[in-house]
Amino acid sequence: MSELIFEKSVKGHKFAEAKLTVPEYKLDSKYLRASDAKLPEVSELEFVRHYMELSKRTHGVDNGFYPLGSCTMKYNPKLNEEVADLPNFTNIHPLQPEHTMKGCIEAMGDLGKKLGEITGMDAFSLQPSAGAHGEFTALLVIRAYHEKRGDHARNKILVPDSAHGTNPASAAMVGCEIVNIPSDKDGNVDIEELKKTVGNDTAALMLTNPNTLGLFETHIKEIAEIVHKAGGLLYYDGANLNAIMGRLRPGDMGYDIVHLNLHKTFSTPHGGGGPGSGPIGCKKFLEEFLPVPVVTGSDGSYKLDYNRPDSIGRVRNFYGNFLVFLRAYAYILTLGSEGIRESSGYAVLNANYLKKKLEKEYDVAFDRICMHEFVLTLEKIKEETGVSALDIAKGLIDDGIHPPTMYFPLIVHEALMFEPTETESKSTLDFTAEVMIKLKKEAYSNPEKLHGYPYTRPIGRVDETKAAREPVLRYKACCCCK
């Protein structure tokens, strides 16, 4: 492992300093540090070489296949980056007077309208900064709706056992009790269990469709009817919208409120903590509760509306991650309605193609046509060879393939979840299948080798348990460096 940038520091090494072009201003001494900050002192060349070296160790969509299930790691067109980098957008400050940023407001308003068309929702808020933030915001809206109606007993959120872990976490954050709904033998929500569970205390059911097993909830209309009849609302986790966009709308399935991941479905770069964007959309009867300000208007005449007495208030400063909005807006405008429909079709086609190639050698968790992703179970392989899903996933790294999602959903033992996305070629999928088949053969012929992968990368097998339990999140200088 190479040295940290702090360890490469040499006193006196520095960049060429730009000349001051404005009058010098001296801060009052009470605002100054008592001692110099321990920042690394390196030259520009040392700086560039250090981060170039680190970049070679980073795997992203631009340099390799990234089939991380439930994450939609599709290619991000560089045109979107050009739009987000236009000076007329980047030089605007959110505290400017509204009349001086009409173009930005129009972009937000039109994006919200287009997201509404795609999802079948009547109104949108772009404020939430990530998927889980969108979940949390949507649940605040649901809570406000029930409270305004005096329905204070509705404090239970129903969550399928295959759901993303953020669903129950978000429900807990708004003070609700989480009730687990099991899956049936086909990987769908168990309808009979749902009927037994709903009642006067049901606030909402949080449901991804396709679900996190990559399967379409075929009884969705019946599910919506059951929840609504009990007085609850149906919430759409938009993590898997990439499988149906342009073909089927959550609003038409009976959903009342949705969150989307612009950083997944609408092709804006993600990973490494952000930036993300998790807008929420809702039906007309929930619009009054959306965070302020709401962008209102149409056809180029948009404005920011703060006059919303029943709004849940702001959920973040300013208006959200604006440059992420622009990337998603450019993506939608570039593809158009037909392109969006094609994208979801190819996403489903690619997933089914790869699944078909692998199911001859691996057990598929649910033997059905999948949507945009599928889940393998390596339980039998582990029982017979001792090789785990983790070992197979790490083996992919040496062939330049990012591991799929491991051990999720939790209801599938030794799970590997693949999501190829629509932007990958047949040759990439064929190569991935070849590597997976090779690794299975090694599991039976040389299991010890599998336990050691990866071998050819700068960093080998990491102790992930230790990293999770004893994280080192900042640089600590040795005693001799103090």
Curated annotation (Swiss-Prot):
It comes from Treponema denticola (strain ATCC 35405 / DSM 14222 / CIP 103919 / JCM 8153 / KCTC 15104). Its EC number is 1.4.4.2. PANTHER family: GLYCINE DEHYDROGENASE (DECARBOXYLATING), MITOCHONDRIAL, GLYCINE DEHYDROGENASE, DECARBOXYLATING. One of its GO terms (biological process) is glycine decarboxylation via glycine cleavage system. GO terms for molecular function: glycine binding; glycine dehydrogenase (decarboxylating) activity; pyridoxal phosphate binding. Gene3D superfamilies: 6.20.440.10, Aspartate Aminotransferase, domain 1 (3.90.1150.10), Type I PLP-dependent aspartate aminotransferase-like (Major domain) (3.40.640.10). The modification N6-(pyridoxal phosphate)lysine is found at residue 264. Keywords: Oxidoreductase, Pyridoxal phosphate. The glycine cleavage system is composed of four proteins: P, T, L and H. In this organism, the P 'protein' is a heterodimer of two subunits. The keyword Oxidoreductase applies. InterPro entries: Aminotrans_V_dom, GcvPB, GDC-P_C, GDC_P, PyrdxlP-dep_Trfase, PyrdxlP-dep_Trfase_major, PyrdxlP-dep_Trfase_small. The keyword Membrane does not apply. This is Probable glycine dehydrogenase (decarboxylating) subunit 2. It catalyses: N(6)-[(R)-lipoyl]-L-lysyl-[glycine-cleavage complex H protein] + glycine + H(+) = N(6)-[(R)-S(8)-aminomethyldihydrolipoyl]-L-lysyl-[glycine-cleavage complex H protein] + CO2. GO terms for cellular component: cytosol; glycine cleavage complex. Its cofactor is pyridoxal 5'-phosphate. The glycine cleavage system catalyzes the degradation of glycine. The P protein binds the alpha-amino group of glycine through its pyridoxal phosphate cofactor; CO(2) is released and the remaining methylamine moiety is then transferred to the lipoamide cofactor of the H protein. The gene is gcvPB. Belongs to the GcvP family. C-terminal subunit subfamily. HAMAP family: GcvPB. CDD domains: GDC-P. It is an enzyme of class 1 (oxidoreductase).
